[in-house]
């Protein structure tokens, strides 16, 4: 049930990242964000100068599969500034998460830069359960590269191998 001050207004947040690949940690951030916002846009930043572990198309397909039954989550890709993408999708907040103080200092710096460039855009830091705070995309990539099982680090039902040669 919406409170009176939210009638007619959706609270939309953008959760930007490379998501290469999308992990249980990312999934937990989205779950926390959905407690605060009506809609969360998972926005995959596409750096055309980098070749990712997974193609951008594969990352998008993987995340869309995770949220196929959740109309409150949208998945997009972008090559512009995150603040510009936030405006394009109607977001008033950027959702981020931190695992430690180093992450916090970095996110605070980015949040202040965004506040300077986009006065109407807030940054919201969410904390994820301790069970997933150690999970990162780089950990998944490294373990996979050395032949280790990464299934427990990915959202349920996601097999990384299904996306490695996606679209080729």
Regions found by a protein language model. Name each.
Residues 2-168:
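Nucleotidyltransferase catalytic core that binds NTPs
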